[in-house]
Amino acid sequence: MYTRRARRWVSGAIAAVAVVALAACSKGGSTSTSPDSSASAAAVPQAVTDLIAKYSGPSTFPPPGPPIDVTPLKGKKIFDIPSVPNPFVQSISASMKEAAEKAGMTYTKFDNQAQVSQWVQGINQAIASKQDIIVLNGAPDPRALGPQLQAAKAAGIPVIVMHFHDNDMPAVPSCEGCTDITATVTAPFNEAGKAAAAWMIKDSGGTANVLIVGGSDILPSPGTIKAMQDEFAANCSGCSNTVINIPVADWNTKTQGVVQSALQANPKVNYVYVLYDAMVAGAIPAVQTLAKTGQVKIASYNGSPFALDAIRQSNGDLVAMNVGEDTPGIGYATMDQVFRVLLGQQPVAERTPIRIWDKTNVAEAGTPAKAGVGYGNAYTSGFLKLWGLGGGA
């Protein structure tokens, strides 16, 4: 019921992520951790309950820096190069355009089909058309664009890389692929992993046996897995987890088979956590084929509409949880960094929000779900006020 729609989304997303990750050289494999044999399910710690509560409602807005006057930016030109034409990135681009136009800037989006050669063309076009700033949105891998980023820097055009590095990674220029970029807008990959682990601890009553399905050729993935394992180790003595790796290039064709085999090898697994929504399409038929709906719950990260719809349609018995991202919040945070860079200010640590979605609140994302819906307007109104363009209190 969910697979066909999900696969339509994945067919566009897989190509993007495959080129976002440089030549995948990692091979599939697995590791596992288990509780002591004497461990029994303990009461869910208050820290777990508090963490879930923190992320179960609409976002609140922490200003990333002092207020700024954006009036000098009227007429400046921003060039947006998105990584892939999927609803998640399209929603971010729409919010960037909205914020740019409120500041009187000229916004241009370079549509493409997630090919490195097209990203190269985009940067070359931005340089030739004398843009004032370039944003790699979603994000085209800066490690694959070294010569073009050098050329942009030589032309005096700052480049911002968005949603590629984790919040915990070093800042520019020490982050990977950051030699010739100006600033980043990082993403809460590890934070989302910790929140997901907390949800599974609570939902299972402290007995989660989790199959974590990663793609280690995606830059932040190892850190996300470690964040999840640290949460289990700290707050769930009765939990266990096994990690398997599926290289990005194989997500569309091998996720179902690999997950199905892992579930057969370990019948005690009761949660499958895929690090990114693009693998949900393969996890669903893996669980269904083994007739484990209601016994094995699928969870993921990104907040893609099809994944949220699957929660609602299965009432949480098949796809049970998703840690989603506020795409308008991401777009406005990106523009805040853009404004500060163009004003000659130091970049700030932009932080973008997440929300835990499950059957108790997924209706707030819309029916059908829509990207960026259900997170509230705290970020958009907060940024507008910070820029002197209106907004709420």
Where are the predicted features?
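Hydrophobic alpha-helical segments within soluble ligand-binding/sensing domains
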Residues: 65, 119, 182-209, 223, ...
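Bacterial lipoprotein signal-peptidase II cleavage site
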Residues: 25-35
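Flexible loop/hinge segments that line or gate small-molecule binding clefts
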Residues: 143, 148-191, 304-316
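C-terminal motif of bacterial Sec signal peptides marking the signal peptidase cleavage site
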Residues: 20-24
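Extracytoplasmic "Venus flytrap"
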Residues: 39-95, 108-120, 125, 129, ...
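Hinge/cleft segment of the Venus flytrap/periplasmic-binding protein
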Residues: 36-76, 235, 326-393
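Periplasmic-binding protein-like
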Residues: 79, 130-139, 158-163, 211-212, ...
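Hydrophobic alpha-helical
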Residues: 139-154, 228, 247-310
